[in-house]
UniProtKB/Swiss-Prot annotation:
Keywords: Amino-acid biosynthesis, Arginine biosynthesis, Cytoplasm, Transferase. Pfam families: OTCace (PF00185), OTCace_N (PF02729). Carbamoyl phosphate binds at R100, H127, P128, C129, Q130, C260, L261, R288. The gene is argF. Belongs to the aspartate/ornithine carbamoyltransferase superfamily. OTCase family. It comes from the Bacteria. It catalyses: carbamoyl phosphate + L-ornithine = L-citrulline + phosphate + H(+). GO terms for molecular function: amino acid binding; ornithine carbamoyltransferase activity. One of its GO terms (cellular component) is cytoplasm. SUPFAM superfamilies: Aspartate/ornithine carbamoyltransferase (SSF53671). This is Ornithine carbamoyltransferase.
Length: 301
């Protein structure tokens, strides 16, 4: 594994190995306290971040590495100088680049023109670190990850894409339930279905909220993605039937609730579900660090 740009680029064994390593790191962190000794990692963020930035920074430091944060929120990469020049210069000093960008093309250019590993910390198309942490979380509750039946409810976005790739490659079942016009991009769905066919996964997309029945976990995200100027009032009525509340959890028979955060409480999910016994949101947040450290250890090994 040279970079970590998208889940779809991994084999089933590579994905399972990352989950296994993340479990080991979480259980025995002291054994890895020197795993990143002497390594310097640059973080380039065009978008705001809490969990991604803090989990990378603290995780890298816990393992003996050094993290440098470059705030790009006042302008996209490539405006002041080309992404190619940016990547090649950073590669002279840094051992890896972690990037959160508006365009996935920027991530790909960093990997193409740099000479060090690049990790996608979120782009418009994918959020692989989040999905890896989420399936690590599920793997802590299911002996066989392929037995998982996950339902995603709401707006099809970058998180949805990465979750679908994970489910397909791991041979799990995932139902994506979105209002009409808010499904993941067709070419992503086609890639996911090809991977599901290869690895034994089952991915279903529908607008029918009744399809929620018979799932182990319900996952949702904000109805409007970061940077989308659409007013919430314009879509609230359309999305209202897809709110995750106690009634929907009961209808699904779900034991777990998941959200990548930040959440709009009372909008896509109620407080009762967010703070309830079924909620895995803090476990997901903690697992971001362990999953990302597994990626870093793998890239540097």
């Amino acid at each position: 594994m040279k970079h970590f740009l998208s889940i779809k680029e991994l084999t089933q064994q590579q994905l399972l190995d990352l989950i296994t390593l993340a479990k080991t790191i979480k259980a025995n962190p002291a054994e890895y306290r020197h795993a990143l000794d002497g390594k310097s990692v640059v973080m380039l963020f065009e978008k705001p971040s809490l969990r991604t930035r803090v989990s990378f920074d603290i995780g890298i430091n816990k393992f003996g590495g050094h993290c440098l944060y470059l705030d790009q929120q006042n302008g996209a990469l490539g405006k002041r100088e080309s992404v190619a020049d940016f990547a090649s210069n950073l590669s002279c000093w840094a051992d890896a680049i972690v990037a959160r960008t508006y365009s996935h093309t920027t991530i790909e250019q960093l990997a193409e023109f740099g000479t060090v590993p690049v990790i996608n910390a979120l782009s418009d198309l994918y959020h692989p670190c989040q999905a890896l942490a989420d399936f690590l979380t599920l793997a802590e509750h299911f002996e066989n990850i392929s037995d998982v039946k996950l339902a995603y409810v709401g707006d099809g976005n970058n998180v949805t894409n990465s979750l679908m790739y994970c489910a397909a490659i791991l041979g799990a079942t995932m139902t994506v339930i979105c209002p009409a016009g808010h499904f993941p991009d067709g070419y992503v769905v086609a890639e996911v279905q090809e991977l599901a066919s290869r690895y034994g996964g089952k991915i279903v997309l529908t607008s029918d909220i009744d399809a929620i029945e018979g799932h182990d976990a319900i996952y949702t995200d904000t109805w409007i993605s970061m940077g989308d100027p659409t007013p919430l009032a314009e879509i609230k009525d359309k999305f209202a039937p897809y709110q995750v509340n106690n009634a929907l959890m009961a209808k699904a028979g779900a034991h777990f609730f998941m959200h990548c955060l930040p959440a709009h409480r009372g909008v896509e999910v109620t407080d009762a579900v967010m703070d309830g016994e079924c909620s895995l949101i803090l476990q997901q947040a903690e697992n971001r660090m362990h999953a990302q450290n597994a990626v870093l250890v793998t890239l540097f090994s």
